[in-house]
């Protein structure tokens, strides 16, 4: 999967600041343990970095 990243939501966005929930929604992560496959771009990497304590990333 060159150029793609698998991201899984491991911690809930409930009770977090609104900013974090908006970033998660932008990544397509709406439910706990949901996994999405995203293209590997600097913008996506930046969003993942903001919520890195809540997600698990597989290259």
Swiss-Prot record:
Q: Does this entry carry the keyword Ribonucleoprotein?
A: yes
Q: Which UniProt keywords apply?
A: Ribonucleoprotein, Ribosomal protein
Q: Which GO terms describe its biological process?
A: translation
**Is Ribosomal protein found in the keyword set?**
yes
One Pfam family recorded for the sequence = Ribosomal_L30
For molecular function, the Gene Ontology terms on record are: structural constituent of ribosome
Q: What Gene Ontology cellular component terms go with this record?
A: cytosolic large ribosomal subunit
Known NCBIfam families for this protein? rpmD_bact (TIGR01308)
The entry sums up its family as follows: Belongs to the universal ribosomal protein uL30 family.
Q: How does it assemble?
A: Part of the 50S ribosomal subunit.
Q: What is the protein name stated in its UniProt record?
A: Large ribosomal subunit protein uL30
Species:
Syntrophotalea carbinolica (strain DSM 2380 / NBRC 103641 / GraBd1)
Gene name of this polypeptide = rpmD
